[in-house]
Structure formats: structure tokens, C-alpha cells
Amino acid sequence: LTGRAGRRGIDKEGNALVCWSPFVPFADVVGQASSQDFVLRSAFRPTYNMVANLVVTRTRAEAELLLSRSFGQFQMDRRTGGKRSLVRALEARLGVLEARGFADGWRLEPRGRPLVRVFNEADLLVVESLASGLLEGLGPADIAAVASCLTFHRRGPGRSEPPARKGEINRRILGIIELAEDLVAEERRHGVPSVEPPDPGFSTAIRRWAAGDDLSEVLTDEWSGGEFVRNIRLVADLLGQLAEVGTTSVARSARR
């Protein structure tokens, strides 16, 4: 499992260097290296962000060669006998980008360029929301509330209740939900698996906190302190990205 060629099953023997650490017993390192039970599975899958970055940094032929030589493709070939291809997955996502006006062949349109710097499970939906103006004209607390529907996923059974149609924040979130439904339909036409839909379940809590409410007032039985902090960090990370790729108005609110 060492080295690119070794991982792909080309080399019979590989060499690895393991950095010494006072916190890791040497016996544990030996056990991992000699184990016959350790299975490495690639989680490598093309995302819209990856497609966008390949488009701006590689030719189409270079991108296809890169994917075809990846460890992920090697494992996929072993599982499916070559019936599935990361290159086809890339082409499918590129087809979605073209259909949505974010790409023209192997070239990003201006509205698709933010994808290069958006790292989110719902990366394309984030950029769709930006392009549709659904994040414009919001104050810091409001943009945090709206952005939270792009990062939050309720744990356990059930889904969050859809927001009421009253109120600007709710209208923006409903707009993003409608965009997501359109995007899912497009992805189905291209055979692209969809991510989880937007979830408004954290919007009220983060808006109250961002507006200055005391944390003890915001936390309820629904949120543990750790879960609240984790979701705050996810929203903060997305806002940091929006501050880099958004319009002047969006960037100003996202930074605050």
C-alpha cells in the first residue's frame, strides 16, 4: 500500500517512512504494517469543486488521465470489473455544470468560477445560491442563518420542518430549497448522485446567537454544547469561503 504504484497493485513491494512520535508505540506501527486485515478504501470521488479545478488547471486529456490512474479508479475496477469510471463521473458532473450555465465545454463561465474556491458538500448549490442573489442584501446574523441550511444536517430520524413563508430569512431559505430541487432533477438526468437537501433546522439558533443573544438562552435540549459549536464552525467555514468568492455585499456581511 506504499507509493502510488504500489497502491495501484503494480509494485509487489513498497517502502514507507513513519515519523517517530512519543505518543505512538513502535509495536503499534509494526502491527499496522504487518496486518493482513487492514483494508484501505479510497473515498476519492469527483465533486463539482474538483471538476472546476481540473478545468482551470488541466486539459481535458490530462484530467482524464489523472482520474484513470488514481487509486480510486484502481479499486473501482476491482469491484466492478471496469463497469464504472471516474472519468464518466467527471463528464456527468461537467454536463450538469453546462446545463446550469456554469461551464461551456472544457471552460468555466464567469458564474462558475467561484466553484474553484467553494469546499462544501453542496458546493454547486452554494454557487447557485450566490448566482441567484439569494445571499444578497443580508446582515451578518441573517446571512449566517441562511448559510446554515447549506451546512446543517439533522442527526437521527426525521427531518426539520420547512420554514414558514413569512420573513425574509425564511423566503431566502425556501428559495435555496427550490434551487436544490431543480438541481436534483438536473442531476438525475445526468446520472449524478445528489447530496442531502438543505436543512433549515439550525437557522433560528445561529441567528439568535449571531445577533447577540446569550448562549445560555440559545442552547436548548435540542442542542448539546458540542453539537452547537460543531455547527457554528461549519457555518463559519462556509462564510469564510463566501467572503472570498461573493459579491462585495455578500463578502462584507460574511466577514462580519
What does each of the following model-derived ranges do?
Residues 1-32:
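Conserved segment of the helicase C-terminal RecA-like domain
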Residues 4-8, 19, 54, 100, ...:
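Conserved, well-folded catalytic cores of nucleic-acid-processing
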Residues 6, 22-24, 36, 45, ...:
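Short, glycine-/Ser/Thr-/acidic-enriched flexible segments
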Residues 15-25, 96, 108-115, 163-171:
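A glycine-rich phosphate-binding loop feature that marks nucleotide/adenosyl-phosphate handling sites
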Residues 31-36, 122-123:
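Short secondary-structure boundary/capping segments
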Residues 43-148:
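C-terminal accessory/connector segments of nucleic-acid motor ATPases
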Residues 124-178:
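Leucine-rich, amphipathic alpha-helical/linker segments
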Residues 158-256:
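C-terminal amphipathic alpha-helical interaction region
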